[in-house]
Amino acid sequence: DLQISQDKQIVVSHDAYFHARYATRPDGTEVKPEDPKEYLYTMPYDSIAKYDVGKRPSTVWPGKEQKPEIKPLASVLIDSMETLTTRLGRSPMRYNIEIKCRKGKDEGINWPEYHEFVDRCIELLLSKNLGDRLVVQCFDVRALNYMHEKYPQLKLSYLTGSKDVDYDTYMSKLNFKPDWLSPHYSTVNETIVKRCHEDGIKIVPWTADDPAEIQRLIDLHVDAIISNYPDRLLKATRGYVK
């Protein structure tokens, strides 16, 4: 997941701000739900890097390892992964990267306007020469249509939410056929999988953490699964993945 700092650095972060669920300020105080949101787009990266986002315990993700972490730069994370896989003699990593732009009254204030958001992120990603190992995903249909027009070489994945249940309705919002559809796992059924495959679209549901749900999706013959628990996914797919 990509966000942008005040000084236009590309930061790996799910949230556009420091979430009260996990963030600790440089002075050691924890970010609380009642506090004003501290948006990354209003802060230079050297300030962002002083916040800790790893050492607090989590009730949302049981088993989370507690250790000091920062929100890294995307360039550093990608370079580190490329170096690691080469050093270990592993197959090169494939990347499914989300650009977190969205509509809203604070667009252009607390996060960038979508053209700028896309252009800055794609400039970085293309500089890494990842080729067909890169898929860019997004909920924002404005951004997806723009990326398809300006960067036709990209593989794009269309993220849809838990209330998006009609295939024809949400697909009609795009000006093109995406390489991937990424629906909320709860909306995935045999019909949607069949429609995707008939249209030549791969399907990758998000975010399945329950082992029974992971198995249900496997049995539906989805093409990939997004999960917070890769160990559970690997265990469930041991007999399916070569």
Label each residue range with its predicted role.
Residues 14-141, 145, 149-155, 176-177, ...:
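Metal-dependent phosphodiesterase/phospholipase catalytic core, i.e.
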Residues 4-9:
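Acidic helix-start/capping segments at beta-turn-to-alpha-helix junctions
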Residues 2-3, 97:
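Conserved metal-phosphate-binding beta-hairpin within the catalytic cores
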Residues 3, 17, 231:
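Catalytic metal-binding/acid-base residues of hydrolase active sites
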Residues 154-242:
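C-terminal active-site rim and adjoining tail of enzyme catalytic domains
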